[in-house]
Amino acid sequence: YAPSALVLTVGHGESAATAAPLRAVTLTCAPTASGTHPAADAACAELRAAHGDPSALAADDAVMCTREYAPVVVTVDGVWQGRRLSYERTFANECVKNAGSASVFTF
């Protein structure tokens, strides 16, 4: 099997370069889901469905979020099925982050 091991972070701010990480978790998806991520099984299943592309994660359109701007930045770094992966995205606030990434960034 090709390795799939990631480190995910979340912090307040508009970019990873200026935001201090508030939380970080590890996520290993091969051969089985493990790591410090609180929902490793669900997060791995969602990443598999998105072919390892965090930008393709399905958003939950049923969630209603306020329009407050309190930016939250997430990062993913590591290896997905043997390929290097580096991803960064800024969400308008924590609610939008949680709705926009299902289990992957909910930690």
UniProtKB/Swiss-Prot annotation:
GO terms for cellular component: extracellular region. It is found in: Secreted. Its main location: secreted. Disulfide bonds join 29-44, 65-95. The keyword Disulfide bond applies. The record marks 67-68 as: Reactive bond. Keywords: Disulfide bond, Protease inhibitor, Secreted, Serine protease inhibitor. It holds the Pfam family SSI. It comes from the Bacteria. GO terms for molecular function: serine-type endopeptidase inhibitor activity. Coiled coil: none annotated. Homodimer. Belongs to the protease inhibitor I16 (SSI) family. Inhibitor of subtilisin BPN' and trypsin. This is Subtilisin inhibitor-like protein 3. It comes from Streptomyces coelicolor.
